[in-house]
Amino acid sequence: MTTMQLDSDGRLRHLLTLEGLPRATLLQLLDRAGQIRDAAVGRVGKRSVLAGTAVCTLFFEPSTRTRSSFHLAAQRLGADVLNFDASTSSTRKGETARDTLKNLEAMGVRGFVVRHPEDGAVERLAEAAGEGTALINAGDGRSAHPTQGLLDMLTLRQAKGTDFSKLKVVIVGDVKHSRVARSDLHALRTLGAGEIRVCGPASLLPDDDMLDGCVVGEDFDAMLEGADALMMLRLQRERMEEGLVPSLEQYHADYGLTRERLARAGRDAAVLHPGPINRGVEITDEVADGAQSCVLRQVANGVAVRMAVLETLLG
């Protein structure tokens, strides 16, 4: 898939996954996003980098943060933004996602931000895209969510510095169903994170090679010791079978992040969550809204990251 993302000169053509993405490309995107974020602090400007370029948010799954973030990012670069709603489109009449893309492409749309419930769906659409058309994966099934991975890495850089070699990161919760966890794991490995710990009930941990090289365990309290950053994951109840967790109350008792548990982690440990948060399940209000929470910073960084990606692909 990495080959499809890059053209013959090594330039990014699509952003489908962070798996196998060259370190230099990853750093280039993060550096550019950081520049955009720094320039935007205290003001919201509009640029003309993508003036005259049409970008479509092609979402076949519900979204609030990601869709709004991409819309704002494209607007701030001067693009014309078309929001596609699957519930009111010809897909209800049987039109395939591929035909939808090709028809919009024929109208002059050059950039597609795609979210889809099926694993690998965005890659298949990228194979069908014409020359000069760029696709960005905004989350497909359990496979990947590359811009979330990028904004998480940008948030970690801001909180902990650019050298990840001594960083101890704990990813907690429903790893099995999480495309965010997959993208974060690929990015952390590429950036040379010192130690990646993965914690959750056995029923919510993947049984493939996704966790190779990670410290894996079910004891949340033990995993927290000395951690520099905690990535709390949402329970993907829409993707999981019944009975994978006994109850939400029991899950919170075992894996919910409370102020008392946070005290076990390293001093000033950063707390991240991709949202939407199930308050009182993955994380308490006190922690979500506390001084160590980076949740809203992640949201703010999302616009900068998506501007950097759109600019790189279409500018």
Swiss-Prot record:
L-aspartate binds at residues 93, 179, 234. Pathway: Pyrimidine metabolism; UMP biosynthesis via de novo pathway; (S)-dihydroorotate from bicarbonate: step 2/3. The keyword Transferase applies. It is an enzyme of class 2 (transferase). Keywords: Pyrimidine biosynthesis, Transferase. Pfam families: OTCace (PF00185), OTCace_N (PF02729). One of its GO terms (cellular component) is cytosol. It comes from the Bacteria. The keyword Transferase applies. GO terms for biological process: 'de novo' pyrimidine nucleobase biosynthetic process; 'de novo' UMP biosynthetic process; amino acid metabolic process. One of its GO terms (molecular function) is amino acid binding. It catalyses: carbamoyl phosphate + L-aspartate = N-carbamoyl-L-aspartate + phosphate + H(+). PROSITE patterns: CARBAMOYLTRANSFERASE. Carbamoyl phosphate binds at residues 65-66, 115, 145, 148, 275-276. Its EC number is 2.1.3.2. InterPro entries: Asp/Orn_carbamoyltranf_P-bd (IPR006132), Asp/Orn_carbamoylTrfase (IPR006130), Asp/Orn_carbamoylTrfase_sf (IPR036901), Asp_carbamoyltransf (IPR002082), Asp_carbamoyltransf_Asp/Orn-bd (IPR006131). PANTHER family: ASPARTATE CARBAMOYLTRANSFERASE, ORNITHINE CARBAMOYLTRANSFERASE, MITOCHONDRIAL. Catalyzes the condensation of carbamoyl phosphate and aspartate to form carbamoyl aspartate and inorganic phosphate, the committed step in the de novo pyrimidine nucleotide biosynthesis pathway. Belongs to the aspartate/ornithine carbamoyltransferase superfamily. ATCase family. Heterododecamer (2C3:3R2) of six catalytic PyrB chains organized as two trimers (C3), and six regulatory PyrI chains organized as three dimers (R2). This is Aspartate carbamoyltransferase catalytic subunit.
